[in-house]
């Protein structure tokens, strides 16, 4: 498939880009080659090939879903440089 200079100019206009004649000619050829490559890839036989999201077939290790006591406010506040009434106290940043 050949991408015309007019198509490149139209897409450039939509993207609010400006190309001179030389750039338009160059991009027309480059985009045509990319479209041809995608066309060739779409013609490859893929029946029986499992879809994948990663180039390497690997399993992501997952930890067990264990319910724990999440109420550890006192433990967390013990690590804070300054705390007041059960909350972190930070320096004033807005006047």
UniProtKB/Swiss-Prot annotation:
Reaction catalysis annotation: L-glutamyl-tRNA(Gln) + L-glutamine + ATP + H2O = L-glutaminyl-tRNA(Gln) + L-glutamate + ADP + phosphate + H(+); L-aspartyl-tRNA(Asn) + L-glutamine + ATP + H2O = L-asparaginyl-tRNA(Asn) + L-glutamate + ADP + phosphate + 2 H(+)
Pfam family, one: GatC
Keyword Kinase included in the entry's annotation: no
Entry annotated with the keyword Metal-binding: no
Any one GO biological process: translation
InterPro entries per record: Asp/Glu-ADT_sf_sub_c, GatC
Domain of life according to the entry: Bacteria
Signal peptide span: none
Keywords, comma-separated and alphabetical: ATP-binding, Ligase, Nucleotide-binding, Protein biosynthesis
Entry EC no(s): 6.3.5.-
GO molecular function terms listed in the Swiss-Prot or TrEMBL record: asparaginyl-tRNA synthase (glutamine-hydrolyzing) activity; ATP binding; glutaminyl-tRNA synthase (glutamine-hydrolyzing) activity
Function: Allows the formation of correctly charged Asn-tRNA(Asn) or Gln-tRNA(Gln) through the transamidation of misacylated Asp-tRNA(Asn) or Glu-tRNA(Gln) in organisms which lack either or both of asparaginyl-tRNA or glutaminyl-tRNA synthetases. The reaction takes place in the presence of glutamine and ATP through an activated phospho-Asp-tRNA(Asn) or phospho-Glu-tRNA(Gln).
Subunit and interaction comment: Heterotrimer of A, B and C subunits.
NCBIfam families, per the entry: gatC (TIGR00135)
Protein family per UniProt: Belongs to the GatC family.
Name of the molecule in the record: Aspartyl/glutamyl-tRNA(Asn/Gln) amidotransferase subunit C
The gene coding this protein: gatC
């Amino acid at each position: 498939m050949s991408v015309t200079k007019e198509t490149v100019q139209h897409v450039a206009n939509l993207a609010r880009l400006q190309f001179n004649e030389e750039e338009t000619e160059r991009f027309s050829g480059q985009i045509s080659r990319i479209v041809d490559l995608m066309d060739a890839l779409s013609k490859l036989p893929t029946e029986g090939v499992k879809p994948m999201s990663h180039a390497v077939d690997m399993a992501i290790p997952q930890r067990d879903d264990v319910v724990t006591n999440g109420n550890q406010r006192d433990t967390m506040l013990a690590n804070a440089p300054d705390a007041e009434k059960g909350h972190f106290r930070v320096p004033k940043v807005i006047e």
